[in-house]
Every structure is written in C-alpha cells, then in structure tokens.
C-alpha cells in the first residue's frame, strides 16, 4: 500500500493541508492509498496549525470507525490518514523560550564570530523569540531548521518510509519558515545519508508547491513582519530555486502558484491570534497535491496553475479547465449536499419518519461517529464560506439554499427529473432507494454508503455529472 508523505511547512503549509483534508473527505481522486501529513513549524500554538490538526484528528476518528471492502461504493473518507508524529508535527528542538541569540549561543562565541553574527543579523533579529516562527526571516530559519535531520521525529519518518512511497512539500516563498525550510528539506531528502532508508528516500519521487505572495499584512510597527518586502524576497528566492533546485534535477515536479488580488490580514506574528480564513490559493495548492499523486514524472517538470476564465469576478466551477472541473465537481458537490442534510435537516434524517431508518441504524444517531460526521461536515461548510467571502472569491456553492437543495452549485441550473417529488422530498426518496442497494453491513459504513449512493445519483440526475 503506497503512501504519500506531505510536508506542510509553516502557516501556509498547515492551511493547504486543511484544504487537502477537505478534499480527502469528499473523495477527490488521490493516487496513493495512505496519506501521512508532517507539519514543520516552530510555532506550535499557531492557530492555523491547531485548527488543521483538529480537522485531521476529526477525519481520522471517522476513518477509524469505517471498514471498507471492495464492494463498498462510497468515495467519502476512503483514504487512510496516518499519524506518525505527535500532532503530526516534526518538532524543532531547543527553540522553546529562547531568542535567536540564545539558540546560537552568541555570548560563548569568539569576538570575531560575534562580530560576524552582528553583521549578518540585526539586533532585532538576534533578540527575536523562536517560539513563534521566523517572522519572515529565512536567514534565521535556515540556521534553526538545519538540525531537523538529527531529530527523533525525522528518524521516525525515515523508519516508516518504504519503496514506492512519494513525498510532497508545501511552502510559501515569501515568509521565513517556508522559504528557508523547503530548500533545506529537499537537500536533506536528496543527499542525506545519516538516517534509515536514506537510499530509498534519496531516490523517491518528490514534488513540491511553492506559493508566491497572495496576501498582505496591515502595518504594525511592533511586528517584525513587513509585507512590503514580500516581492523582493520572492524574486531572490525564485532565482535561487532556478539555479539550485530546477536546474540540478533534485525535484520531480515543482508547482508555482500566485495571485495578484491580495487580501489584507491582521499582522499577527504567530500564536493563537494567527488564524486566517481559507483562501482560493490554498484550495488550488491542494489540487496540486492531487495532480502530483495521480501522475508519474520521469524528469523535472515545472507547473504553473492556470484558470480558464476568471476576469474580475469570483472563481466558479466554470473557471476551471474541463479536466480539473470533472475531478472536483462531483465529489465536492456530493459532499456539500450530504453536509446540508446532516446540518440543516438532521432532525428529520435521524427520526423514525425517515424510512431508511427502519431496520437500520439503531443507536447510530447518538454515537460519537455521527457527532464526528456532523463536526467535519460543519467544518466543510465553514471552509467553503470562508473562501467565498474572500476578496478573490472562490464561489463554488450557494450555501443558503434552505429548502431548495439543488440550487446549490453557483451558476448551474439543476435539470428537471421525472418524478412527482422535488427538493428534500426527492433527496429522501433517493436515500430510501440507496439504503436498499448498500453492500455495507456495519451501520457506520452503510450510513456513509447510503449518502454517497443517494448524492451521486442526484448529482448525475440534476447536473449530468
């Protein structure tokens, strides 16, 4: 069973993993059987990180309650999401409660070395706390992250790696953690020889996405992060990537992603205040992981994401090229329709009035499985809503359909169906039919399969998808 290890570096890495987990839940086609996320971020209290960790725990709890066999038709929650590290996080050693100068032990250096360090780093850099990341300073990050290869967590990753497994790296190019972490991690994976299975890892298929600036930060004199420097940092980093990554064939597939329409966020250096709404760019970055997982690369390939039609308006399904629209439309739509049933019509679908409950699902509705399922579908709707209200809006779905469940896809008029039933009466009819066709025996699996069969039939009937 092949695995895809996904390294999410910094806050951007955590946010992209959030979008990718949503796609996994919905059943977007992924080439590998098992996904192993690994987050690299010294800021353990980063709210973007803790939110993603909670989501992945939610997914794993649901997945652990399901036992799929070849006859189960559902695509929801089909892939395994494995945890090999505490909180999925590769811990960076010796950074807790330390400034950068304490980390490098500046006072113990010879005077000539101290003078050199003070030339390379400002006093503000030297006094910078390591607890909340590198605050847009890849020069600091390069020194701190250089020791991850010696960590126990990296050894755990290496010990688990097997022939045929693949690696994908998510990072931003304009910050501190991502900009420094990506080149260092890639070099370690390709050339490192001090860890288990290094020969297999050195020759593994590796892909990465580097995300260019897609947001700005409000001015804050007390913050060390200045978004006006993002572009200059990006230009320098791109030149480095060209000469030291692309040209030496150290990577199999390198994806680039950027947007010139920028949201402006609060300038929070890290911790529990750093929680940003989901963004189109993070959604698209997750599709790069999907693309990489479904392809093989015989030589270095550089890929830049493109949309078919966008103009000045929101991004909808019609903005995607045909292949990507086909990959995303059905699973995301089926899952949003199930989410609406479980969040807005749950009282009915958990009652005896719903015929499918007769001789099925006894005791299920008060279980932790249903609670977990409601939580993740609510999170899915929140995620869609966050992306929709951004300045660069990803407007895939109407999230206020109320009693018109088929008015759900933005820009798509649902087709008429030959039936005396409509709206949620038609949804109920399709679910009642679906439960009779389920191959699953256990209630948890049968419940998920019922919704998948019912929603997939409706999406085909209403949207010809």
For each of these PLM feature ranges, what is it?
Residues 9-15, 171-182:
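Gly/Ser/Thr-rich loops at beta-strand to alpha-helix junctions
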Residues 21, 178-190:
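Short Gly/Thr/Asp-enriched flexible loops that form oxyanion-binding sites at enzyme active sites
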Residues 166-170:
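Beta-strand elements within well-structured catalytic alpha/beta cores of enzymes
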Residues 1-25, 29-165, 194-465:
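Terminal, contiguous helix-loop blocks that mediate binding/assembly
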